[in-house]
Amino acid sequence: KGHFIEVKRDDLVGEYQGHTAVKTKEVLNKALGGVLFIDEVYSLRNGAGDDFGMEAINTIVPFIEDNRQNMIVVIAGYSQPMNEFLSTNPGLKSRFNTTIDFEDYNTDELYEIFKGVSKDFNWNETTTKKIKDYLSNMIMNKDENFGNARDVRKFFENIKKHQINRLVEYSDLVDN
């Protein structure tokens, strides 16, 4: 098959007792023969009272052990929450024993991403410098939740929102 399935907590956790195991097994069975990617997997464990999330974890662990020759499971998230997540079940660390830490992008790389998401816009030299300065400042002030390309996309969406607001204000002036 060689297919790819990406899921999050909502795709695995049910709405009532017993529903989570069924829902999780459906996803796991669909992933057989392919790759299952669970983004922000630590969201399955939202605290000590999260029985539904724990039910999903307890369904995943034996399933991937029994089917390790027929699927690849990749879990992703920020480093610290991932380490905490891997401690929630004794079988997790041994089943996910390869870790890849991606370095954050530098200013030039973030600017290339910005150019990609804003390809339909033209930026003059002054604006380009301001954008690069903003991206550089974003890196200098980042915290453990820094979103790299996601933060660049959000930055661009914010620029578009402000542009739309200015155009609306301008059209109000012209109409009057």
Where are these regions (language model features)?
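Short glycine-rich substrate-engagement loop in P-loop NTPases that contacts/grips substrate
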Residues: G2-A31
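Flexible beta-alpha connector loops of hexameric P-loop NTPases
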Residues: R9-T20, S43-M54, T99-D101
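Short loop/turn elements that form and flank the Walker-type P-loop nucleotide-binding site
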Residues: K30-G33, D66-N70, F146
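Conserved catalytic/switch belt of AAA+ P-loop NTPases
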Residues: Y42-K93
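Conserved C-terminal "switch" segment of AAA+ ATPases
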Residues: P81-S87, F102-N145, I164-S171
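C-terminal helical "lid" of AAA+/P-loop NTPase domains
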Residues: G147-E169
